[in-house]
Each structure stands twice: as C-alpha cells, then as structure tokens.
C-alpha cells in the first residue's frame, strides 16, 4: 500500500509527532518517581498535547484540550493527577476521594486504569478503584465501604450510581477531575449524570476536559464545569502523499501524523469481493475492519473464515451487544496478536489503544462523520505509521470532498482487477448452513435501516440504494420482504436469485439447533391443525334472549313518579333562574315547553299557565325543603341513639 516516497514521508511524520521537550525538563518539574515510571514505559519525550497540558494542570489551571486521536492524551492527564496528589502535605484518609477520571466506555476506562497503574503505584498510601459496568455492584459497594478509595476511574453511569448509593466516601477535598472523550460522553447521553457528579464536587478543584472534537455541547460543558479554562488546541501540519509520491500542501489536519488515508469506489455487488482481495494483499498485518451494525459484524465474522483465501486467518468479532466477558476476551486476544483481523462496530472507534495496528478498513462509512477520524486514529498512534482506507459506492463519491473540507484529505486507490468473486462461495455456505443464511438476512436488513439514519443523508441517501446489488454483496439467496423494499421503488437491478431452492428446508449445521428447529416446526404444525377446532369452540352458540318481564303496577308508578319529580325539579331550577333575572319569561316558557303550540290562539292562556307552573315550582321547593329537614332529623335521631348506647 505504500511506496518508498510515502515511507520517507511517514518517517518524517514520526519525528514530528514528538516535541523536543523531554518529560524530565518540564516546568513545573516532575517527581523522580514519575520520570522513572515514564522511562520504564518507553516515554522520554512529550507529544505536543502532553507538553502543553501537563504544565498547565500542575500550575493550578483548568484546561480544555482539543487534540487529534492518538496524540497521547491519556498521559497528559494521568501524570498531573499523580503529581498533584503527591504534593499533598499529608497522606489521605481511606475514604477521602482526591481524584476522579471519567471516560465514556468500559473499555476506555479499563485501558486508562491499566495505563495509570505504574504511576499510581508511586504514590504511598493512595488506593485506586475501577468502576465500570458488567460487575457486581453490591460487591463493589461493599469493598468501597470497607476499604475506600482515593482515586476513582470509571464510566459516568457507574460513578453516578456509586455516588447516589454510598455516602461513606468524602469528596470535599477532591483535587482534580478529568473528563476524557468529553464529546463522546455527551453523544452517549451522559449529560444528566455528569451534571449530577459535578454538583457533588467542590468548586475549588482543577478540571481537565479532553476531547478530539469541540462541539457546542462540549463548549457548554466547559462553561459549566471549568473555571477560566485555558484552551489547548493541538493541530498537525500534514502533507499527504499523492499517487505520484509528491506532497500536497493542505494545511492543518485532524488526523495523526504518519497516517495515510485512501478511498476506493466500487459497485455494491463487487464490494465484498474487493474487501477480501484487499485483506489477502495485506495478509500478515494487524487489521481492524469497521461495519455499520452489530448484525453485520456477526455475519461477516462467520462468513470470512469460510472463504478459501482467508482460511487460517484469525478473525475476531467485537461489538457493543456482546456480553462483557466475551468482549474483554476478544479485545485481549486481538491485542496480543501480531497479525489478524478484528471485525467491529464503532464501539471500537474511540479511546481503545490497541498496540501495533497496521491498517484500518472502513467497509461501511460511519453514520457520524466525526467518527471517521476516530476510526482511522486506531492506527498511526504515537510515533508509528499506519494506513486507512474507506470503501464507497459510486453515488457516495462526494464524501471525499466533504472530508477534505473538514481537514481529512484522502487519495484514491483503484479497484483490484484480480479480485475473485466470493458471492458463489457465500451462497454455497448459506445453502449448507441455515445459520449463515439467517445471519445474512439479518445483517442485510440492519444495514439498510442503519443507512436510513445516516447523518449525511444528502450524500448517503437510502432511497438511492441499489438493493439488488447490495443483496449480491451479502450473498443472499433471495431479497427479504421488508417495508423499505415493499413500499419504495428501490432498484432490484443486479440481483440474481438462486432458483429451485426451498429456504424452509435449509438445515442448521449444528445438530442440536436443527433438532430444536424441527421440534418447533412440529409443534407449530400441530397448533395449526388444531386451530379450526379451537376457533369452533370459541364461537359458542349464542344464548337465546330471556323474555322481558312486565313491570308491576307499583314499579310503573315508581318510574312515573321519578320522571315527574325530575321534571318538577328542572322547572324549579328554571324558576329560580327567572327570579334572579338570569333568563326572561320568554326563555322560561320556551325551556319549560309553554312556548310551543300548534295553535296560534293558544297564546291567550299563556299567563295563567305560567302562573300555574310557578305555583307548582313553589310546591316542589316546599317538598324538597321538607325532605331535607326529614333527612336531617333522622340523622340527628341516629346520632342521639348512638350516644345513648355509649352511655
């Protein structure tokens, strides 16, 4: 992937990645113990971000650091934390928390904790604890309650939980708070937890906010959590190498020095074949391949090892839906390899410091364009060189110009003319194993739906997706029935379905799974056969209606009396309104029915009828009052009897 001229450029970049400033020459000076620990880890000279941030934090300043991924941010805050705690006049009490480091993911928190251990070990009488998800919270709370901790490293969710549940830890004398990958913390929705954590800490502290991108949300967080912060912005001047080996002046770049970025444009039906050819060309390297979804990772993690050209290559899946144990094991396994392939999602895009990664492949461009830089930054870290490539469809070519305008220049790489078509091999595997077929369908559907949610929808328009060619890329036997295909005129051009195949008869290679599937199919068939009988039972014959019994004379009289009383009560209410002047006599007549008559001459008797109605209303009033008095007297008598009984 690199020529002799590009190798020379990368070598020059490695030299520029470090400053001439040595850790031993920083001012304020570092302690001999920390300098020794740095030398033990192979760190003698500072990166630009370390040279800028460490002295500021040690000089009682708050800092907001904006630096490219892979620039050495971790040591830029671990060293100040250790030095600040070392300078305290007396050793801390067991439950006195003096330093907190917050990062967005379990993996990043664990990585920071492991990097910091040699430095924490130089502090006498100071204990530390890692607080991340996936572990028994009760056991952690018990340990904290019994032993305490002076430095806490963890994720915001877990730290918030601990602070809410446990009141034995003392934060009043906290010296320093670090927020690492601040933009990612906010993207993941931790704003509420971070605000709550900060509210429980003393204002007279030092705070470091470290981020690869300065978003508006990060700036707002800096205003809320930092006091007069010093802004540290570290950018690198990059001169990427073109096809002819000449260097192009492009000014400041957000990518690490020593990183070569390329892109390849190919049809969807040829994309998976180009990927495999590219992996074969770079056999023996340590490679990370990024996919859009967890389902895509699961699918390609089982398909790639089945291909003839990649048999024997270690291929490890890694995504956010894996359980904590397998995730940690996968990461540890890949980190220990000298060569191999990690197929992953964006959960591995930030913060992870995997050693000696040679090549980054972005098979699916990220939904968020900011993540592009973080993915590429897994290689070319510190003083190393590395390569990264992104695969694009023909209609996505404007993404190249978009990245260039954001300070991420790319050079084109032509499609290989020798790439072997892998679709027949994938389809053959799907016909032999139902697991491959099902995972392919799930991955295909998940990719289409993820594509719909792309932040750059004007470049990655899902309505322009060529579903037919995409189906060939995934080696599908048939295009699945899904709303995106059913209700929209997406192109099925380029797809050749496998004929004369009954997909319901494809079996699992795993005998136990197939046995369970057959049991399920048998049970469903039995349920289907019984359904008509069940439906028949449900539709029981309707019971004949009981003949209605005639009401007795008393019942009829009671109904009539109630109706009369209701009518009289209504008239009385209207009469009261008339007396108060709420309504006039015409309205009263209309509402009581006196204004309605078929004969014009009937109006002559209106006055006498009105007087009669008023008299009836007064009688109703008298009856209602009498009833009220009777009820009141009965209540009084009841209370008197109760008092008599008590006596």
From Swiss-Prot:
It comes from Oryza sativa subsp. japonica (Rice). It catalyses: ATP + H2O = ADP + phosphate + H(+). This is DEAD-box ATP-dependent RNA helicase 18. Residues 619-633 have a biased composition (Basic residues). Keywords: ATP-binding, Coiled coil, Helicase, Hydrolase, Nucleotide-binding, Phosphoprotein, RNA-binding. ATP binds at residues 67-74. GO terms for cellular component: nucleolus. A motif (DEAD box) lies at residues 180-183. Belongs to the DEAD box helicase family. DDX55/SPB4 subfamily. SMART domains: DEXDc, DUF4217, HELICc. Its EC number is 3.6.4.13. Residues 54-232 form the Helicase ATP-binding domain.
